[in-house]
Amino acid sequence: MEDVCTECGFDQSSTPAADVGPALERTATEVADAVRSVPLELLRRRPEPRTWAPIEYLGHLRESMAFHRWLIEQAVAQDHPEVPMVDPDESVAAADYRGADVEDLLGQFHRRVMRLGAHLAALPPGAAACSLTLGDRPITVALIARSAWHECHHHLGDIRRPGGL
Ligand SMILES: [Zn+2]
């Protein structure tokens, strides 16, 4: 849950939540283009045993977009709720994305990005300051929104890497 990342060069710590939706949608389009550009023989292959295949990064992002929207809903609907941390490695392994249809996943990812963007655009005044505790860390709606964008930006690099794009 970050809005500054030295690894991928992302720094949107001053971007207001209201501006995140359109930017997220643009980055998500780049993700979809990158996935479609990965050579078929590399799409489902892990470069190393502990590094996800490109299609697994897409599956993770599909989950991540729904999770971020759900977190924002919880933070706005309740008074600083506590939400347990999730393990992305576990859920990606359980979903078996390497056996999934890539166009199905791209469609689901796109719909979840659009839903998250619409949700951000419709946030009531002051909602960006609503907060929750994820694991042991207090976070605001504004950070959750920027973090969703960072997820796409960060994994765009992971998806491009194995194909050398
Ligand atoms: Zn990053």
Give the residues covered by each predicted segment.
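Short, contiguous alpha-helical
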Residues: 1-2, 44-88, 129-165
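Amphipathic, non-membrane alpha-helical segments in soluble helical-bundle scaffolds
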Residues: 17-28, 51-58, 99-106, 141-145
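A glycine-rich, hydrophobic loop/mini-helix early in the fold
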Residues: 26-52
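Acidic/histidine-rich alpha-helical segments that form the ligand environment
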Residues: 23-27, 32, 90-129, 148
